[in-house]
């Protein structure tokens, strides 16, 4: 007969190790979703990734107002970003991305999930892949992309000049669209 604390886990196709670690984190947390999230995620991140709890967000916006986020992350690379998104999905933690914080108002009550910011050097990389292709990180500033492209003879980036923000933000907000 089952006791109140007994649990049964059925695993189908997929990554058994990931599910086993998630289940173990959940068991250790005694039902605390955020503790389970942290227990699962922390060992999967590189040392240079930032993961903070109850992080004030006002200083991360140009307006300088707003509350805290339950979780805040600055992943060092794409593998860490993938681990963060995976953990959010596994533990039902809502997530949101921010860029440089321009034109962003954070509610005073904050955000109960995880805020991700692509801030480190990995995300700011701009490099040529071929003679007519650039590889650009989502955190690269538009003015720096424009300058880099112009200095190396790339065409078609001129419209970025004068648009504030990063590539990720520009794509999200459809920057430069006319009408």
Predicted regions located by residue number:
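ATP-dependent carboxylate-amine ligase
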Residues: 1-35
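Anion-binding (especially nucleotide phosphate/pyrophosphate-binding) glycine-rich loop
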Residues: 38-167, 171
């Amino acid at each position: 007969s089952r006791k109140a604390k007994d649990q049964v886990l059925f695993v189908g196709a997929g990554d058994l190790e990931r599910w086993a670690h998630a289940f173990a984190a959940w068991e250790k947390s005694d039902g605390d979703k955020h503790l389970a999230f942290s227990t699962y995620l922390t060992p999967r991140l590189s040392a240079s990734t930032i993961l903070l709890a109850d992080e004030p967000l006002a200083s991360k916006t140009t307006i300088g107002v707003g509350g805290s986020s339950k979780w805040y992350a600055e992943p060092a690379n794409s593998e860490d970003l993938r681990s963060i998104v995976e953990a959010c999905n596994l533990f039902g933690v809502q997530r949101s991305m921010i860029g440089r914080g321009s034109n962003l108002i954070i509610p005073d009550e904050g955000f109960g999930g995880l805020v991700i910011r692509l801030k480190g050097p990995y995300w700011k990389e701009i490099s040529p892949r071929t003679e007519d292709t650039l590889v650009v990180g989502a955190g690269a500033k538009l003015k720096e992309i424009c300058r880099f492209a112009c200095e190396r003879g790339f065409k078609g980036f001129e419209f970025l000049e004068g648009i504030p923000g990063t590539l990720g933000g520009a794509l999200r907000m459809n920057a430069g669209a006319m009408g």
